[in-house]
């Protein structure tokens, strides 16, 4: 792919999501900028405790392991490692078949044959995301869970969801590190520095920047105190319009992808509570892009133009894990209303 930055590392959670995929939420594991120099994992040893989740379709596996067991702590420390096969790079894929590739025949029948092909090192990298040290919350986050849909009224948000969120220790220091250029400054694709209506645009962890099919960037607003969709009012329209227009323009300039080939949306519930907007390739089924979580930014802007209190009053539907305490609280309120 032309005019793309080299693959770099970054830690956010993701989360995700969805992530819903390790999302930009995995950032909690560190704030250092990416580097092309040889690096080491931030721990020694890795003894697998449990496979938290795996997907043959997505070529990804989430592992819980014990590390640093040789440091004198007999119990070691917890870490989560996410291993993901990277997508093919179209401009390099022909190299897999030139010369004498290393092959192992699986079967042959008439015109059909299947092989295991062992690619050269530069075409066989595995994206590795590390969460270390990992807490019980991280282990639960990455473990496969059953989901349930729940409808949250405006009153539910004010009396249940918001107090619950405020009671949790949800650090977003990694977000401030990006905004303050303490981490990942070299990864910023575009910035509007206005403290009220500006933002930074940065590649999401789920995109390795080697092809456009799964393009994924995040716009993070400079203004602090806007937690989610629920906080938005007409006061924030200049910010939202800037993100939509300038974000699309920056992506067109850098990646030659036009606005009508982008899906631009917010999550609710978000994976972290500092306003951010997702930019993904329209043909990419990104985690969290389903109707129960994604809200198109253009529609959000129009809703606020029509009704200043739209997101304070509207009932919003989203999915929660069955073991999420917030689900129990909202279900109880729903039962009492019925």
UniProtKB/Swiss-Prot annotation:
The modification N-acetylalanine is found at residue 2. The modification Phosphoserine is found at residues 23, 100. SUPFAM superfamilies: HIT-like (SSF54197), mRNA decapping enzyme DcpS N-terminal domain (SSF102860). It comes from the Eukaryota. A motif (nuclear export sequence (NES)) lies at residues 141-153. It catalyses: a 5'-end (N(7)-methyl 5'-triphosphoguanosine)-ribonucleoside in mRNA + H2O = N(7)-methyl-GMP + a 5'-end diphospho-ribonucleoside in mRNA + 2 H(+). The modification N6-acetyllysine is found at residues 137, 141. One of its GO terms (molecular function) is 5'-(N(7)-methyl 5'-triphosphoguanosine)-[mRNA] diphosphatase activity. Belongs to the HIT family. This is m7GpppX diphosphatase. The gene is Dcps.
